[in-house]
């Protein structure tokens, strides 16, 4: 795993500078096999950690590579036998039953962003597409020192969040200064209680394997929380982000 949470960013900064100092300085850079670790049995791969990990790294590395390919799409991986568990730490965005893992949602959030970058920080990004504004926020929690140093003994099949440093909720306030305008806001929320199918699996007794009724419940629980609000342009918005949480706000002006 990445010992430093800036590992991907630092590596790409180094690579881009190294390429620029060669006669091939104008070649494209494509990262074809990227994930949080090279271990297809890393139990962290199933946890809520993966959604903000993906969002933060893709946002932070804008402009450093022409593409970054996630490894892989599903947990059905021809280089290894199928895992013994429904959630065995596979690389994929989908598990072997086709359930959406947190990494799937990380890429879904990125897919909703606009093509014009307005503002970017370490915990949120603001974009625009046509007349719509997108605000994507996340509360990233990195590994603790034990796990970051390559010792997996601090976690188990059912206790995986002991791999992470303790961190509290984050509060983000948004203020509009357009009192004459009105907006429709759609909010999508991901955290351990909303959209993290691994956590729902734990909550439902960690069935191995789940039967069809249990799978249907898990499919439902793997979806994001969402709701619509209508706001005046002078309203203030306060968003509470749980650890490992991601929230997307989409604003559309109302004529």
Short names for language-model regions:
Residues 1-68, 85-87:
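Noncatalytic carbohydrate-binding groove/subsite architecture in carbohydrate-active enzymes
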Residues 35-38, 74-77, 141-142:
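Solvent-exposed loop/turn segments at secondary-structure junctions
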Residues 137-255:
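C-terminal beta-sandwich/jelly-roll accessory domains of carbohydrate-active enzymes
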Residues 31, 123-144:
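Hard-cation-handling environments
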Residues 70, 78-82:
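Flexible, surface-exposed loop/gating regions in the mature catalytic domains
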Residues 58, 84-120, 144:
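Catalytic cores of secreted or luminal carbohydrate-active enzymes
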Residues 14-26, 60-67, 110-116, 175-179, ...:
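A structural motif corresponding to the C-terminal end of an alpha-helix
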Residues 65-72, 102-104, 115-122, 184:
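Acidic/polar loop patches that form or flank catalytic/metal-binding clefts of enzymes
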């Amino acid at each position: 795993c990445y010992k430093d949470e800036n590992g991907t960013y630092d590596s790409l900064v180094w690579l881009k500078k190294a390429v620029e100092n060669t006669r091939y300085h104008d070649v494209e850079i494509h990262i074809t096999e990227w994930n949080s670790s090279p271990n297809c049995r890393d139990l962290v791969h199933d946890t809520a950690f993966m959604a903000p990990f993906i969002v933060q790294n893709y946002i932070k590395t804008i402009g450093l590579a022409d593409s970054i390919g996630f490894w892989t799409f599903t947990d059905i991986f021809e280089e290894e036998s199928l895992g013994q568990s429904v959630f065995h730490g596979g690389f994929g965005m989908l598990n072997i039953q086709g359930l959406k893992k947190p990494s799937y949602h990380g890429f879904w959030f990125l897919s909703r962003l606009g093509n014009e970058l307005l503002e970017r920080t370490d915990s949120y990004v603001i974009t625009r597409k046509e007349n719509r504004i997108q605000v994507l926020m996340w509360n990233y929690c990195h590994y603790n020192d034990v796990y970051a140093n390559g010792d997996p003994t601090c976690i188990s099949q059912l206790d995986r969040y002991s791999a992470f440093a303790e961190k509290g909720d984050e509060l983000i306030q948004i203020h509009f200064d357009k009192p004459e305008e009105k907006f429709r806001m759609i909010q999508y929320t991901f955290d351990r209680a909303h959209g993290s199918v691994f956590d729902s699996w734990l909550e439902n007794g960690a069935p191995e394997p789940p039967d069809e009724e249990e799978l249907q419940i898990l499919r439902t629980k793997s979806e994001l929380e969402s709701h619509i609000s209508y706001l005046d342009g002078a309203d203030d918005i306060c968003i509470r982000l749980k650890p490992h949480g991601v929230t997307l706000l989409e604003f559309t002006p109302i004529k």
